[in-house]
Swiss-Prot record:
Pfam families: Myb_DNA-binding, SWIRM, TADA2A-like_3rd, ZZ_ADA2. Zn(2+) 1 binds at C17, C20, C42, C45. One of its GO terms (molecular function) is transcription coactivator activity. SMART domains: SANT. It comes from Homo sapiens. Residues 426-435 bind DNA. This is Transcriptional adapter 2-alpha. A zinc finger (ZZ-type) spans 12-69. It is found in: Nucleus; Chromosome. Residues 70-122 form the SANT domain. InterPro entries: ADA2-like_ZZ, Ada2/TADA2, Homeodomain-like_sf, Myb_dom, SANT/Myb, SANT_dom, SWIRM, TADA2A_B-like_dom. GO terms for cellular component: ATAC complex; mitotic spindle; nucleoplasm; nucleus; SAGA complex; SAGA-type complex.
Length: 443
């Protein structure tokens, strides 16, 4: 007979009988061939030869009981559990009620056995001491330092960064200003009543379907932002800057296709092209060495050092190169001489030198989907597109200039530049636009 003690003397703590679903009372039967999970039977179902699915009445079995001694030869495991439960129910020291609940031991036997094996036993004392020491070792004596995280960023409410992030709330993983933020306005006046005509009912259902499609588009954009990690824009820009200029241009071009492919596939594509660029650059460098007749890296280091020295010497001849460049054009030569005179006198150059190559102007800013676009009129949208200024920033600058103009009774360009800490050319265009449209007056 195999004997195994239960965890508790309460029948509800034991598994139910698979035959009659009653709570098991010791002794009970466990099938040695079925399981997991274990297959338990009470004695009544076992004597009836209960069979269920794969379980057969001729399977080998184990008798589960707790009549074996643990701490004392005269105390069974079942009595040990009954003693502990009685002390927990009746309280320590109330040995008469403990003995009455146990029914098999006197109060003197209960007190003597409990004090000997559970209070004065050095084995239990050392075990409890070790557990206490281990618990104290886990608890730090000093305060746990708290470090704020910037991923995702947590800007202060109503700050410029918070508006640029459309009011992203990290604790809720949601935005204050949603994409298509006023989609719910189309539903505010819709009410389904029983006397609606079929056409009116179909029209209302079409409006609801359109609203559902707009919600799906909103969730799709949120998923793209979450999957590609676009919440932390600063971290995204730092990752982009670690690539060479050529790969950054590819990154900028392929960004619009990121919504089609997954984030992992998009990153693999960019990384593969970055690796290709590095390999091409290394091959070009090795080809340059071979063209110069260099066949080992020791000579290549000397070649690179001499090449760097020649480049520095060439840059020192910049003034002579400028003279040779503008000497054929009298007007350009006069401008260059005035510029050099200003530099020699310690003044900033008053006449900028024209570049032959010409700098390509930046394309107009696309305002589609940017927060605050719906608050602008057509002329303001054109201004934001030309100066490449997001609508939220423009509205903030406009409000600051209007408030200052109302306080002073007018506003000068110098005051506007002091209020708006951005590029002076953009400030001039905003100032001229507000003057031209009559929002502010000159001081």
């Amino acid at each position: 007979m195999d004997r195994l003690g239960p965890f508790s003397n309460d029948p509800s703590d034991k598994p139910p009988c698979r035959g009659c679903s009653s709570y098991l009372m010791e002794p009970y039967i466990k099938c040695a061939e079925c399981g997991p999970p274990p297959f338990f039977l009470c004695l009544q179902c076992f004597t009836r030869g209960f069979e269920y699915k794969k379980h057969q009445s001729d399977h080998t079995y184990e008798i589960m009981t707790s009549d074996f001694p643990v701490l004392d030869p005269s105390w069974t495991a079942q009595e040990e559990m009954a003693l502990l439960e009685a002390v927990m129910d009746c309280g320590f020291g109330n040995w008469q009620d403990v003995a009455n609940q146990m029914c098999t031991k006197t109060k003197e036997e209960c007190e003597k056995h409990y004090m000997k094996h559970f209070i004065n036993n050095p084995l239990f004392a050392s075990t409890l001491l070790n557990l206490k020491q281990a618990e104290e070792a886990k608890t730090a004596d000093t305060a746990i330092p708290f470090h704020s995280t910037d991923d995702p960023p947590r800007p202060t409410f109503d700050s410029l960064l918070s508006r640029d992030m459309a009011g992203y709330m990290p604790a809720r993983a949601d935005f204050i200003e949603e994409f298509d933020n006023y989609a719910e306005w189309d539903l505010r006046d819709i009410d389904f009543v029983e006397d609606d005509s079929d056409i009116l009912h179909a029209l209302k259902m079409a409006v609801v379907d359109i609203y559902h499609s707009r919600l799906k588009e909103r969730q799709r954009r949120k998923k793209i932002i979450r999957d590609h990690g676009l919440i932390n824009l600063r971290k995204f820009q730092l990752m982009e800057r670690r690539y060479p200029k050529e790969v950054q241009d590819l990154y900028e071009t392929m960004r619009r296709f990121a919504r089609i492919v997954g984030p992992v596939e998009h990153d693999k594509f960019i990384e593969s092209h970055a690796l290709e660029f590095e390999l091409r650059r290394e091959i070009k460098r090795l080809q340059e060495y071979r063209t110069a007749g260099i066949t080992n890296f020791c000579s290549a280091r000397t070649y690179d050092h001499l090449k760097k020295t020649r480049e520095e010497e060439r840059l020192k001849r910049t003034m002579l190169s400028e003279v040779l460049q503008y000497i054929q054009d009298s007007s350009a030569c006069q401008q260059w001489l005035r510029r050099q005179a200003d530099i020699d006198s310690g003044l900033s150059p008053s006449i900028p030198m024209a570049s032959n190559s010409g700098r390509r102007s930046a394309p107009p800013l696309n305002l589609t989907g940017l927060p605050g676009t719906e608050k602008l009129n057509e002329k303001e949208k054109e201004l934001c597109q030309m100066v490449r200024l997001v609508p939220g920033a423009y509205l903030e600058y406009k409000s600051a200039l209007l408030n200052e103009c109302n306080k002073q009774g007018g506003l000068r360009l110098a005051q506007a530049r002091a209020l708006i800490k951005i590029d002076v050319n953009k400030t001039r265009k905003i100032y001229d636009f507000l003057i031209r449209e009559g929002y502010i007056t000159k001081g």
